Regions:
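Charge-rich, intrinsically disordered N-terminal extensions
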Residues: 1-436
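Long, amphipathic, Lys/Arg-enriched alpha-helical "connector/arm" segment
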Residues: 9-20, 350, 450-474
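Short hydrophobic/aromatic segments of transmembrane alpha-helices and their interfaces
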Residues: 354, 382-383, 447, 460-464
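A generic structural signal for ordered alpha-helices
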Residues: 377-380, 445, 449
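Long, charged, glycine-rich C-terminal linkers/tails
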Residues: 395-399, 439-448
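Short alpha-helical interface elements
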Residues: 406, 431, 441, 448-451, ...
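Short, highly charged low-complexity linear segments
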Residues: 413, 436-445, 460-466
């Protein structure tokens, strides 16, 4: 069997499809399209719609070179192929062509290129265009054009898509369909159904920073957190200053997302200190104002903590705004903004400290400043014994050694006693909650006797006499 016949046997269904197109393409005279059918099969083109302009021109030249046809016959046959192609394009892609015509984009030459590309991709409606289709178009353009031309084509491509989106959201079903909801897919910010936001992104040269890939292999929890943060930022922050929003939030969040995926981090609220330090090294290579960009860590944790349906007691940082505390527990002149547990690197100890803090914040009546002070001292104790399985396994001798070291430091007796009191309260909590059977130290053994300290605030006679003489001036 010849190679051509073998190929035809393998492509039988595709060849039959092509034949049906010619038979039903509006040209009844078989002799006008018979050669065209053979030509396309030889080119391994099995759909007349997919024949490029170059193919059509070469078909005409093939007819001329064969010497079998007059110029009139060549013109008739080459025209027949074009007419059949046009018939099937309008039959199968008429709605797409209409949508492109209605898109209010004036550059017909660029629209024609886009139209041919979409037809080759089997796109029947503009709403089928997504970032993946755009990426394929961009890759195709880069093979033929310089950067400036590629950007011109893509600008028209994006305008066509954006016009389609705006038309769709004029109806209720369209608005529902375009409602932002998390899906494992790529989100391209210029394709959002918010015209004001879309305008902000038009002049961003590096469009990659506008691509948010939620299809990539990563923790679903992380991806949902980033999606929530992205939408919160777009909807609520710097709507009137897109440059500031980009620099302070969008770019740093993009870097943070990439970092977490690479590091296999699955929870932004569980970021550890050493992970944050590694991320900072990456940021240092990207911007001069590192401090500005690093605020994305605290901003992200805060947004997630404040917007969660339920309080995230497991979070490494708690934000007091979430708790709606009574005024008598707050100091309005110097309010405590957050309680941090990230400094406790032993995770079991951190969980115990969070339980203790949860009790004080939720049930106890101490002021938040007082709670923070207690937690600060307990954190020092926990970090000292971070190598142990947990603070519950630390015995009396180990604690005695720790307390003796505290005594050796230049610490006032009153300060030392306060620390012992903070520690005993923490241990009492662990004991009551059943984390340990008995408290491994007796506070009275360590508490020191203290005396009220008198602060001499007397002033010299010369000074107070001068004050008395000048009182009349006040």
């Amino acid at each position: 069997m010849s190679a051509i016949r073998l190929l035809q046997a393998e492509r039988k269904e595709e060849i039959q499809h092509l034949h049906r197109q010619f038979m039903s393409g509006g040209i009844l005279q078989r002799e006008l399209w018979e050669e065209a059918e053979k030509f396309l099969i030889q080119r391994e083109i099995y759909d007349v719609i997919l024949a490029e302009e170059q193919d059509l021109r070469e078909y005409k030249q093939t007819l001329l070179d064969s010497g079998n046809y007059t110029k009139k016959q060549v013109k008739e046959q080459s025209s027949a192929l074009r007419k059949i192609q046009k018939y099937w394009i309008e039959t199968e892609y008429g709605e797409l062509l209409l949508e492109i015509r209605e898109s209010q984009v004036s550059d017909e030459a660029l629209k024609g290129n886009i139209k041919r590309f979409l037809i080759r991709q089997g796109i029947h409606h503009i709403k089928e265009i997504d970032y993946t289709v755009r990426s394929r178009y961009e890759a195709e353009l880069k093979k033929m054009w310089d950067e400036a031309s590629v950007m011109r084509y893509l600008k028209v491509f994006d305008h066509i898509k954006q016009y389609s989106i705006q038309k769709e959201i004029e109806s209720l079903p369209g608005r529902i369909e375009h409602r932002r909801k998390y899906q494992a897919q790529v989100v391209f910010l210029p394709y959002l159904p918010d015209l004001e936001l879309v305008k902000d992104f038009e002049y961003v040269r590096d469009k990659q920073e506008l691509v948010w890939d939620f299809f990539r292999r990563a923790s679903e929890k992380l991806k949902k957190q980033v999606f929530l943060l992205l939408n919160y930022i777009l909807d609520n922050l710097y709507r009137d200053d897109p440059k500031e929003r980009r620099v302070r939030y969008l770019l740093p969040l993009h870097w943070l997302y990439d970092f977490c995926v690479e590091e296999e981090i699955d929870d932004l609220e569980g970021l550890e200190l050493e992970q944050i330090q590694r991320f900072e090294k990456i940021v240092e290579q990207k911007v001069v104002n590192v401090k500005n960009s690093m605020q994305i860590i605290d901003n992200s944790r805060k947004i997630l903590f404040l917007t969660a349906p339920e309080i995230h007691w497991h979070a490494n940082v708690w934000y007091m705004e979430r708790f709606h505390l009574s005024e008598d527990r707050l100091n309005p002149s110097n309010p405590v903004q957050r309680l941090s547990f990230i400094e406790v690197t032993n995770k079991k100890n951190r969980e115990l400290l969070q339980e203790y803090a949860k009790y004080h914040v939720g049930i106890g009546g101490l002021t938040i400043a007082n709670i923070r002070g207690q937690l600060y001292e307990v954190k020092r104790l926990l970090e000292y014994f971070k190598e142990e399985e947990s603070i519950c396994q630390v015995d009396e001798n180990q604690l005695d050694d720790y307390f003796r070291k505290l005594e050796e430091k230049d610490t006032k007796d009153d300060t030392f006693n306060k620390r012992i009191v903070h520690y005993i309260k923490f241990y009492q909590f662990l004991n009551v909650r059943g984390y340990m059977k008995e408290i491994p130290f007796k506070p009275e053994y360590y508490l020191k006797k203290t005396y009220p300290e008198h602060h001499d605030r007397t002033v010299e006679e010369k000074v107070y006499m001068e004050i008395l003489h000048k009182l009349y001036a006040f």
